[in-house]
Regions:
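N-terminal nucleotide-binding beta1-loop-alpha1 segment
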Residues: 5-11
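Short acidic, Gly/Ser-rich segments with clustered Asp/Glu that frequently serve as metal-coordination loops
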Residues: 13-18
Length: 171
């Protein structure tokens, strides 16, 4: 039986503000996911990238964690490298992770692959990861490429947010 936790990765004010709509679409979807997790009693772990600047570490206020929810800081793309995430998951009996958040091609990708390498089943709700345009691909192209070509069937299962929210989780 799977025990699930949800990782909200790098949804920080300075990063989200770089999205064309200021993060409205992403934070709306994440709010729905977070509400579902809270209702299902799925633990939420907020991951912040900490590079020493106060402003960049602030989680976007639209998805602010509750005091009882876990916030972990990281210094590398993977949420597992030099953090307490793996030991926390082990202590909680977590075997399945829902991964969502910012910078699809960097921190989300690194976290998904690290989770897979550690034996976790990984779920990624479509539209709950985001990035910005780069010189090669638009943000949408990057997100679709990672979801359909890199992660699906290899490192993670990709689901529509609606289908995920309609299913009870295994506790």
């Amino acid at each position: 039986m799977e025990k699930t936790a949800c990782l909200i990765v790098d949804v920080q004010q300075s990063v989200v503000s770089a999205l064309p709509d200021g993060g409205e679409e992403l934070t709306e979807k994440l709010s729905r996911l977070i509400t579902w997790c809270r209702q299902q009693m799925v633990p939420l772990v907020y991951i912040r990238h900490d590079d020493g600047e106060d402003r960049i570490s602030e989680i976007d206020s639209r998805i602010k964690p509750k005091e009882s929810e876990i916030v972990m800081d990281k210094s590398y793309p993977s949420a597992f490298l030099e953090t307490d995430l793996e030991s926390w998951c082990s202590e909680q009996g977590i075997t399945q992770l829902i991964v969502a958040g910012m910078m699809t091609e960097f921190c989300i990708d690194a976290t998904i692959k690290s989770a897979f390498e550690r034996g976790y089943q990984v779920l990624v709700p479509q539209g709950c990861c985001a990035t910005v345009d780069n010189e090669y691909l638009t943000a949408q192209q990057t997100e679709e490429f990672f979801e359909k070509r890199i992660w699906q069937g290899r490192y993670a299962q990709i689901f529509s947010l609606e289908s995920l929210l309609s299913q009870p989780v295994k506790k």
